[in-house]
């Protein structure tokens, strides 16, 4: 019984409430005319779409940099990779992998500078990261307008320059992962094998990395910087590595998202994508200084499940669209819960 | 050495102000706007925004950083205005009514905000920011679903056609500029909303007076060092809550002043940018996370809005696209906040490192005490 109690305490009431709420939604779904198989398919799809961006939170949480509110830098690197891949007319799997390869140098450069900055402001990372992210997005807004892209599918038709706000990847690498070895059962259920395999691959690599020498050192830095320094770990270097990995995963994450979603969204589109990723890992049970693969898995499924199920079920139930309000309250409530909880734990 | 150091301290302290003055001065000629037009715009915007920015002062004194949670007060003010329009109370009486409705709500929200921040000491800013988003969800729920269904709305013209929920934009015709227009002073071609400025001046007097009271002194003590204040018998948590409540109430009044000047209310997102603009303004004026004065507020509002006035047109002229100017001003707004926070955090760490070096005594000497080595030591030593 005591075990059960501590388990509940560790897991946290908000997660349990969200879990049961989600289960209730699934149970209600057939009664209000929402197809269960289609819903499951949606949840799986959206899980794959978002999981890598959530995974990107892990390294920085582990190294003690807190929640990566500056994930936008990684997302922008991914957007640069994706747009360059279209500009070079890369199609199919080559286009998708090309986008990732092209995004890599950007993510490393952005991540490196971002890490330099965060190392100078230890203790204030989260607020600063948020504003660095915002201002960088605004800077890139200007860049999207003036960079010399000229692929006609990407630029505004009448002006011949300046990228569109949404660019379709339909003729390039739409659903290239989703359709890879996809298993179709019935009319409504599709198991996106390729997408989930890709996510699993990255999660596995991250799992391996956290158990490597560097990964262990990184975790040590996050748990106790003074102790890590005393045992000869270069704190700033470990933090830099974690930030670069996080930024890189952000870039990969948005490219995976785009191939499934079908559109590259530019300009201010990346900024609302950061908070859901933060909220998801926290719903999964991470705190602001500990996170694991299980947190990523559970969190993304719960959060995306909620996002998929609330519009369809609640709307048919109440005849009104409350999903947006629920999304705002749940995701921010979760972040708030995590921010106010750590003190109790450290006591 | 010392003079150079002084100069570098001066630049790092006022870096943001200096950058801003330079950017704005460069942008004025290409914008093609007359100085007179810019001045009139600044006067209008000083009246519109100063009150909101002044609401940030007390939490800074209490060591809670920039109060991003002020958005809570802004939402309370909006609820007040919705009811004022609903009951058809016009002119300045409508504003007073809105304030009376907003007051208890903002006290309650401020109390909640204070409690939450007390549980997240050292992370007040990011917590306040997220709390504003969270309460925004509740605000949306209240305005979109409760008003008109649970709480009856008499004025059907402000309710969505489905029968409940408030329309996306609310016309504040009945209270538009009712505070500004009580006495509109016209001096040398400029129109100055006298009463608005008197209200702002009264708030400044209040802030100055408040700092001298027992509570104000306690607040500063808490801001200096919570542990010491606690030891001296000051109720730290309570003092912090009071600071946030006052700030939230002022933000509520500030948002009402802001909206009466604008003349219409974007029901669901008018408050989105409130905290952002107010914080950007006070930082542009040379304030930091721990230090701010009334002068910072007015200098900041003037500089920030001077740039907001000129940048879209300057962008249009220089790059052939007004959008670039628009993005540029947001980039600058966010960038200013980021730079100020970075400079502040960096300075704090540098000061701590220097203090440590001076403790270490003579063998290191003052030669190592400046610049880069000390910063590196913060992480390594």
Where are these regions (language model features)?
Chain B
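Single transmembrane alpha-helix segments in multi-pass membrane proteins
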Residues: 24, 36-87, 111, 116-122, ...
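Alpha-helical transmembrane segments within multi-pass membrane transporters and channels
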Residues: 90-136, 304
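Transmembrane helix-bundle core of multi-pass membrane transporters
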Residues: 135-211, 320-325
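Helix-loop-helix "hairpin" substructures at the membrane interface of multi-pass membrane proteins
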Residues: 188-266
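Transmembrane alpha-helical segments in multi-pass inner-membrane proteins
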Residues: 251, 255, 259-330
């Amino acid at each position: 019984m005591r075990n059960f109690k501590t388990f509940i305490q560790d897991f946290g009431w908000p997660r349990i409430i969200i879990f049961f709420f989600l289960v209730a939604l699934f149970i209600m779904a057939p009664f209000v005319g929402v197809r269960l198989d289609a819903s499951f398919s949606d949840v799986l799809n959206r899980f794959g779409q978002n999981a890598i961006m959530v995974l990107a939170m892990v390294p920085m949480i582990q190294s003690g940099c807190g929640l990566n509110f500056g994930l936008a830098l990684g997302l922008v690197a991914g957007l640069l990779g994706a747009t360059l891949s279209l500009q070079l007319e890369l199609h199919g799997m080559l286009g998708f992998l090309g986008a990732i390869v092209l995004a890599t140098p950007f993510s490393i450069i952005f991540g490196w500078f971002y890490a330099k900055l965060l190392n100078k402001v230890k203790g204030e990372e989260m607020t600063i990261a948020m504003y660095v992210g915002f201002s960088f997005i605004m800077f890139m807004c200007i860049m999207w307008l003036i960079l010399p892209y000229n692929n006609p599918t990407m630029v505004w038709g009448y002006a011949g320059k300046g990228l569109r706000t949404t660019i379709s990847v339909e003729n390039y690498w739409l659903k290239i992962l989703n359709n890879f070895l996809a298993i179709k059962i019935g009319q409504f259920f599709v198991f996106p094998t390729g997408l989930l395999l890709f996510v699993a691959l990255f999660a596995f690599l991250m799992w391996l990395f956290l158990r490597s020498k560097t990964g262990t050192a990184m975790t040590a830095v996050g748990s106790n910087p003074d102790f890590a320094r005393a045992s000869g770990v270069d704190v700033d270097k470990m933090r830099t590595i974690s930030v670069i990995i996080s930024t890189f995963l952000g870039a990969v994450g948005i490219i995976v998202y785009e191939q499934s979603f079908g559109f590259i969204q530019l300009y201010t589109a990346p900024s609302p994508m950061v908070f859901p990723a933060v909220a998801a890992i926290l719903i999964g049970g991470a705190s602001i200084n500990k996170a694991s693969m299980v947190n990523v898995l559970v969190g993304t499924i719960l959060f995306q499940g909620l996002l998929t199920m609330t519009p369809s079920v609640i709307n048919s139930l109440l005849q009104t669209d409350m999903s947006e309000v629920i999304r705002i309250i749940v995701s921010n409530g979760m972040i708030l819960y995590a921010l106010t909880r750590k003190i109790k734990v450290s006591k | 050495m010392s003079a150079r150091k002084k100069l570098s301290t001066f630049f790092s302290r006022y870096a943001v102000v200096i950058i801003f003055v330079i950017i704005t001065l460069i942008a004025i000629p290409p914008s093609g706007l007359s100085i007179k037009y810019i001045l009139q715009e600044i006067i209008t915007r000083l009246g519109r925004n100063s009150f909101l920015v002044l609401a940030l002062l007390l939490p800074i004194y209490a060591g809670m950083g920039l109060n991003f949670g002020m958005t809570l007060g802004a939402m309370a003010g909006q609820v007040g205005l919705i009811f004022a329009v609903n009951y058809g109370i016009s002119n300045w009486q409508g504003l007073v009514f809105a304030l009376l409705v907003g007051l208890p709500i903002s006290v309650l929200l401020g109390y909640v905000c204070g409690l939450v921040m007390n549980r997240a000491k050292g992370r007040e800013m990011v917590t306040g920011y997220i709390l504003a988003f969270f309460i925004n969800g509740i605000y949306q729920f209240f305005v979109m679903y409760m008003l008109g269904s649970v709480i009856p709305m008499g004025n059907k013209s402000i309710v969505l056609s489905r029968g409940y929920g408030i329309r996306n934009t609310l016309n504040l015709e009945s209270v538009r500029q009712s505070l500004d227009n009580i006495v509109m002073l016209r001096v040398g071609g400029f129109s100055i909303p006298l009463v608005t400025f008197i209200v702002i001046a009264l708030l400044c007097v209040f802030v100055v007076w408040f700092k001298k009271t027992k509570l104000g002194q306690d607040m500063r003590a808490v801001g200096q060092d919570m542990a010491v204040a606690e030891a001296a018998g000051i109720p730290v948590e309570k003092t912090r809550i009071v600071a946030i409540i006052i700030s939230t109430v002022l933000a509520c009044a500030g948002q009402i002043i802001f909206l009466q000047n604008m003349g219409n209310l974007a029901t669901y997102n008018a408050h989105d940018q409130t905290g952002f603009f107010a914080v950007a303004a006070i930082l542009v004026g040379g304030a930091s996370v721990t230090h701010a004065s009334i002068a910072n507020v007015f200098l900041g509002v003037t500089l920030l809005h001077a740039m907001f006035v000129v940048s879209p047109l300057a962008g249009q002229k220089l790059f052939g696209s007004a959008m670039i100017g628009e993005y540029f001003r947001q980039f600058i707004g966010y960038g200013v906040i980021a730079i100020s926070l970075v400079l502040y955090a960096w300075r704090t760490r540098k000061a701590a490192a220097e203090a440590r070096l001076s403790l270490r005594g003579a063998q290191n000497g003052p030669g190592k005490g400046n610049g880069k080595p000390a910063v590196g030591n913060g992480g390594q030593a």
